[in-house]
Amino acid sequence: MEELSILELASKGGWIMIVLAILSIIAVYIFVERFLAIRSAGKDDKLFMDRIRDYLKNNDVKSAINFCRNTNTAAARMIERGISRMGKPASEIQTAIENTGNLEIATMEKRLPVLATIAGGAPMIGFLGTVIGMVEAFWQMSNAGGNIDISLLSGGIYQAMITTVGGLAVGIIALFAYNYLVAKIDGVVNEIEAKSLTFMDIVSEGE
């Protein structure tokens, strides 16, 4: 029995498989780029807030700001904005922190809608390829009249099904990648929320 490699199967899927290949490359790029960006934004220093507390207790605002800039995480950028508002009403400091936090979250979520679209759209594109292939197979069957070659018909059908397999594969991988990144972002969000509460406690202690 003849065996086909994955590459040979993909080549039989026609132009739909080219579209799916492009989508898979885009999905991999987005996943790797976002993974690295989120990991950088979410680096956790357990002693970060202790250092900030010490600097502010000693009224060393400049060192606190420099420490935030050198740490360069989402939480650090948020705390830096809060420090720059110190001396103003607590509500204004809180608003500044929340606005910066929202910007950081939006930055981490950049391109995720594209990944979600690929996760949902790739299976549909694959199914479209299958429908097109089935239409072509039955068109050939109708033109053959009474001289139907079952082997040719079955060959056309299995080639049509290849695009559904390809679409599902790309969609499933993209879906897992999307959910993984969302979970990573949720972890960073929880971290920056905890640090923002700690910072507001520090501000209250200094009043």
Question: Can you annotate each of these PLM segments?
Answer:
Residues 1-47:
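Hydrophobic membrane-targeting segments
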Residues 42-128, 132-144, 176-207:
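Predominantly long cytosolic amphipathic alpha-helical stalk/bundle segments
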Residues 133-161:
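Helix-loop-helix
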Residues 158-176:
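Hydrophobic alpha-helical transmembrane segments of polytopic membrane proteins
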